[in-house]
């Protein structure tokens, strides 16, 4: 889909942390003329959840996790002087988009750096989006101003390994938490998958 939205004489180009839109704000690079588009990594991961809400209705909802990575030509040095790609105009742009894009109903709540993201400069070259529907608002702790998903953020650096008790296997820990606190289960399941994808990309 084209991302430029015309308003009168102005054109507003969207910020696209995944860098999949041809008309993202960094493309093309004015400095290098390179096409600033990332590649999708693998398939979109779908995490299905089923729960009963406060009204007693059974709700089924799927969280989608999309990962992207800058192709090698964007990460390679540029020009005769072998300028570091991170020092280019688009390198600066992608650095400002380091984080996981949390999207609710097609609108970004926040670009979260709460997940397993350290100061390694290579983090600028990937993008991850977590997309969910409003029926998960309470479970994920969406704030009234729709700027964060606090319950998800609170476990963002966790994995299922952190919840194993005694000699529990990871499978047993998942089942126990799911039975004890389903909201926590959903948040940990998402965080675990996101951090696994970050680790595999890096």
Can you name each region flagged by the protein language model?
Residues 1-3:
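ATP-binding catalytic core of ATPases
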Residues 5-30:
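N-terminal non-catalytic structural scaffold regions of very large proteins
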Residues 21, 29-202:
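Charged regulatory segments coupled to nucleotide-binding catalytic modules in large multidomain enzymes
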């Amino acid at each position: 889909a084209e991302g430029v939205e015309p308003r009168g004489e102005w054109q507003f180009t969207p910020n696209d942390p995944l860098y999949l839109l041809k008309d993202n704000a960094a493309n093309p690079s004015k400095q290098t003329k390179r096409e600033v588009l990332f590649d999708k990594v693998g398939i979109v991961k779908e995490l299905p959840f089923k729960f009963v809400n406060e009204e007693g209705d059974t709700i089924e909802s799927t969280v989608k996790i999309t990962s992207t990575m800058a192709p090698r030509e964007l990460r390679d040095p540029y020009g005769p002087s072998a300028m570091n790609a991170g020092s280019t105009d688009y390198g600066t742009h992608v650095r400002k988009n380091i984080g996981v894009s949390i999207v609710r109903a097609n609108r970004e709540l926040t670009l979260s750096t709460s997940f397993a993201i350290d100061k390694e400069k290579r983090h600028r070259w990937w993008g991850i989006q977590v997309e969910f529907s409003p029926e998960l608002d309470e479970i994920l702790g969406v704030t009234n101003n729709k700027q964060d998903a606090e319950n998800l953020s609170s476990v963002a650096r966790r994995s299922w390994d952190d919840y194993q008790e005694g000699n529990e296997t990871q499978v047993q820990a998942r089942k126990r938490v799911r039975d004890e606190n389903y909201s926590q289960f959903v948040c940990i399941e998402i965080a675990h998958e996101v951090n696994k994808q970050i680790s595999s990309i890096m």
